[in-house]
Design a protein with these regions (language model features):
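Short, structured beta-strand segments at or near domain termini in extracellular proteins/domains
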Residues: 161-176
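Short capping motifs at secondary-structure boundaries
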Residues: 1-12, 47-48
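Functional-site microenvironments in short loops/helix caps that host divalent-cation chemistry
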Residues: 15-152, 156-161
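Phosphate/oxyanion-binding loops and surfaces in catalytic or ligand/nucleic-acid-binding neighborhoods
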Residues: 6-7, 67, 115, 170
């Protein structure tokens, strides 16, 4: 990974029984996980992008269409999203095209929670690590987390099997890739 070789990110953090899939070519189309917020942001910066804000993420998921989920208002099922442990792990990017947003953006619900640029603020966070908002739910989360307006938060220093990211780009930066 370019991010690791340029020393902007540390190698993925593996815990327990999860396979070191980033080292296996069979998993090259899977989301990057076990990555902290800062490492995700560094990765995006190396590729001339940034993490999306929560508003940008919701726009890509289709919030302006007045829908509950990226694919519409139909209740989640396992043809639309990877959630609730059904697939017993992660699925490759684009595995469930029926769950695409109105803009054709894939994997906006389920598989991995996605870091956003936005910090989470609560009265309970008394000077500890900065918490960051994650969107989309994960392969181990309940269906309610798949709603476009739902969110979760974790310490920006944390990394886990259910946390990943996507980068956003300006029109100018796309031509430079």
């Amino acid at each position: 990974m370019k991010c690791v070789t340029e020393e902007k990110c540390t190698p993925p953090h593996y815990r327990g029984y999860f396979e070191k899939y980033t080292e296996n070519i069979l998993y090259r189309n899977y989301p990057i996980t076990y990555i902290s917020w800062q490492e995700a942001e560094n990765y995006c910066e190396i590729h001339q992008g940034t993490l999306p804000t929560e508003s940008q993420w919701m726009a890509a998921a289709g919030i302006t269409f007045g829908i509950r989920y990226p694919w519409g208002d139909e209740e989640p099922n396992f043809a639309l999203a990877n959630y609730d442990g059904f697939y017993q792990g992660l699925t490759p990017a684009g595995w469930l095209p029926q769950g695409a947003s109105p803009y054709g953006v894939l994997d906006m619900a389920g598989n991995v929670r996605e870091w956003t640029l936005d910090p989470y603020s609560s009265d309970d966070n008394m000077g500890g690590d900065t918490d960051r908002i994650l969107k989309g739910g994960s392969s181990s989360d309940y269906p309610q987390t798949l709603e476009i307006t739902a969110f979760q938060w974790h310490s920006e220093k944390s990394a886990g099997f259910n946390r990943g990211f996507r980068c956003v780009y300006t029109a100018d930066s796309v031509g430079t890739k």
